[in-house]
Amino acid sequence: SGSVDLGENVILAGDVGIADNINIGSNSFISAGTKVFKNFPENSKIGGYPARSLYDWQKIQVKLNKMLSKIRWATLKLLP
C-alpha cells in the first residue's frame, strides 16, 4: 500500500475513492462518487468510475444520447 499525493487546493466531493500511490495536481476538482486509479495533472476536473476528465465524460454522454436516440427511433419504426 502507499499514500496519495494531493496538490494544493484540491477539492474532493463525497464518496470519492483514490487508489494507492496516486498523484492529483493542485487546483483540481474530483466530483462525487469518482474512483481514481491513475494520476491527474494540475487544474484537472475529474469524474466517473473509472475517473476521467469531466470534459471526456461530457463527450461520452453526448455520443451515448445520440446512440440511444437512434435506437429509440429504429424501434419505433419497427412497431406496427
Report each predicted region and the residues it spans.
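Terminal amphipathic alpha-helical/low-complexity segments used for targeting or macromolecular assembly
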Residues: 44, 51-80
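Structural signal for interior beta-strand "rungs" in well-ordered beta-sheet cores
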Residues: 1-53
